[in-house]
A protein has these predicted regions:
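A polyampholytic, Gly/Pro-enriched intrinsically disordered region
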Residues: 66-76
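Mid/C-terminal beta-alpha module of Rossmann-like enzyme folds, strongest
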Residues: 2-64, 100-107
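Short, amphipathic alpha-helical "lid/cap" segments that border enzyme active or binding sites
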Residues: 1-9, 77-84
């Protein structure tokens, strides 16, 4: 969240009218299945998947954000490991569904 918060504040300097669309996400394209498997490995658990993988996916193009703000200081691999450490250390979770199966943008 640190990088996203920093970009949100720094982004005010780049506000335009009419607006410019800018996706703020990591530079890597990551598979939810692969991330789940990696997180499960850190946690000593095997993820359980329901349903079938879709033939399409939502991808965000963060190239404009990367051009303006640079690459984040923390890579996806480190974020996954940190999340596992947080959970293993007894960190609080909200136990809410992820809605990764959502295909119409209604979260």
């Amino acid at each position: 969240q640190g990088t996203a918060n920093e970009i949100a504040i720094r982004g005010l300097l780049h506000a335009t009218s009419p607006m410019t669309v800018m996706n703020v996400t990591g530079p890597e394209t990551v598979s939810i299945k692969k991330v789940s498997e990696k997180l499960g490995k850190y946690l000593g658990k095997k993820p359980i998947f329901e349903g079938e993988e879709g033939n399409d996916a939502y991808l965000n193009d963060a190239s404009l954000a990367m051009e303006i703000f640079g690459y984040p200081d923390v890579c996806a691999e480190t974020l996954i490991r940190w999340q596992a450490e947080y959970i293993l250390d007894g960190g609080r979770t909200l136990n809410k569904p992820t809605h990764f199966e959502e295909r119409k943008g209604n979260y």
